A protein has these predicted regions:
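Nucleotidyltransferase catalytic core that binds NTPs
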Residues: 1-180
Length: 180
């Protein structure tokens, strides 16, 4: 059964205001973070989110911070309109889709030296000169598993998840097995 069209929010302040509006109505907010190109596994997380909250927010954001400069970010699949259409058929629907352009963009005031010193790992974000300087590190994960071959992956994921939590301010978050 098709649901109503979700509200699309691209501005982080508007997203935060939406969440606070829901909270003022005593609604619990569940959040599912995605990079888009939604498949049945991700859609099932949204169905699960409905079991734990009154409203569901989904982010669709390709995180530059988890890609190394030598990875081809342009080949990452993207179909925003298709994703929104798929969300219409999730039982219970989705109230809001947060689709920011760039959560690392600091405008003119950000630094533009294009990287970090001392031979540290560099992601697409630093290489682009956006001036992002604060990162959330998960050192144990960075040293093992795929952390050795994907030097910025866990740092980028942990950082963006922290940013999204601070913007969306969810009561409940639903992750899948591949998110750990």
């Amino acid at each position: 059964m098709e649901q109503k069209q979700p509200l699309i929010i691209r501005d982080k302040n508007q997203m935060r205001n939406w969440s606070r509006s829901m909270r003022s109505q005593f609604k619990l907010i569940a959040f599912v973070s995605t990079m888009g190109y939604l498949h049945q596994g991700r859609l099932s997380l949204i169905t699960e989110a409905h079991k734990h909250a009154n409203v569901v927010a989904v982010s669709i954001y390709v995180n530059l911070g988890q890609f190394s400069p030598n990875e081809d970010l342009s080949t990452y699949p993207s179909d925003f309109e298709g994703d929104v259409q798929r969300l219409l058929f999730v039982p219970g629907g989705v109230e809001v889709v947060f689709n920011p352009k760039n959560l690392y963009d600091y405008g003119e005031s950000g630094g533009s030296d294009g990287g970090v010193g001392g031979g540290e790992v560099v992601s697409c974000v630093e290489k682009s000169g956006l001036g992002h300087e604060s990162w959330v590190r998960v050192e144990k994960l960075e040293k093992g598993l795929c952390g050795k071959s994907m030097s910025v992956f866990f740092r980028g994921v942990a950082t963006i998840v922290a940013k999204l939590f601070n913007i969306v301010e969810p009561d409940v978050v639903v992750f899948g097995k591949n998110d750990y």
